[in-house]
Amino acid sequence: MADDPAMASSNPISDDSLANAYTQIFQILEKHNIPATFALVGLFAGAYEQYVDSRGDLLESEPHRNWLQVPERSFAAGLHDGWFYPELVDQIKSRGNHEIASHSFTHLPLHNEGVTEESFFTEMKFINQWKQINSIELSTFIYPRNQIKFENGLSDFNFVGYRQCDIQNSAYTNRFRILQDECNIGRKSDAHSLSTKPVAIPPGTFLNWRHGPRRVIPKWVTLKRWSNVLDHAVASGGVAHLWLHPHNLITARGQVELFGDAIARVAKTQKSGLIETVPQAEYCKEIAQQAQPRNHE
């Protein structure tokens, strides 16, 4: 949403609504004892003052300067509400069982016009600074808008995996095809990743955002679709990887309940001993271990 012109004058997301959305996510995950990966945009998971400190260097990059036009207009108008969440890192760390991953530093889509490998390195430089400030390790990466590029360079910055992209979550997919996929109650789980460096984590299943045209999709269809993914993972030994955007809980009616019901289905399957729930970094570690040659006596 960082490039939505409306954000410069009327941000639909406030500090309070953002904090409430994350509180609800934490409560649902804790209720069912489910670990998760939280992929954060470093710039906005910090304070406005930290943005001011990095602003000069960022705006020297033309792709970043173009990308940050909307936030710049918002901040120039004195509108900071809903943009920054500096408490989030500590809130995640305090839970003890969740992973913090990187969702870039500025959310710059790497397929934007003018984006080069130097732009990618600029992102990585600021990500490194951000993780040092917050005393965290970052092991996995989720590309902004799922636009994958320069993935071979991630290992140079100690990333062991990144989330792959499929038709469902591609930025270029026709909206009608997306709606078709959201209504596909026969959706299957993903096959396991190969042991590559970095690991291409299965793209997973997006939890329908009940907003705009998507809100016509009944809740039962979304839950049936997700249940089928879980059942197929159990039957085939595949991967059931659910993901969403936290701001979806703010901008869509009934999204909190939908997320809670989807996680309850995960918990039920886990309690039956049929699946194991792990964050992305642990999944990549398991894939790497499985690929190691075994000693035979």
PLM segments and residue spans:
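Catalytic alpha-helical scaffold of carbohydrate-active enzymes acting on polysaccharides/glycoconjugates
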Residues: 1-199, 220-242, 249-297
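Active-site clefts of carbohydrate-active enzymes
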Residues: 199-215, 244-248
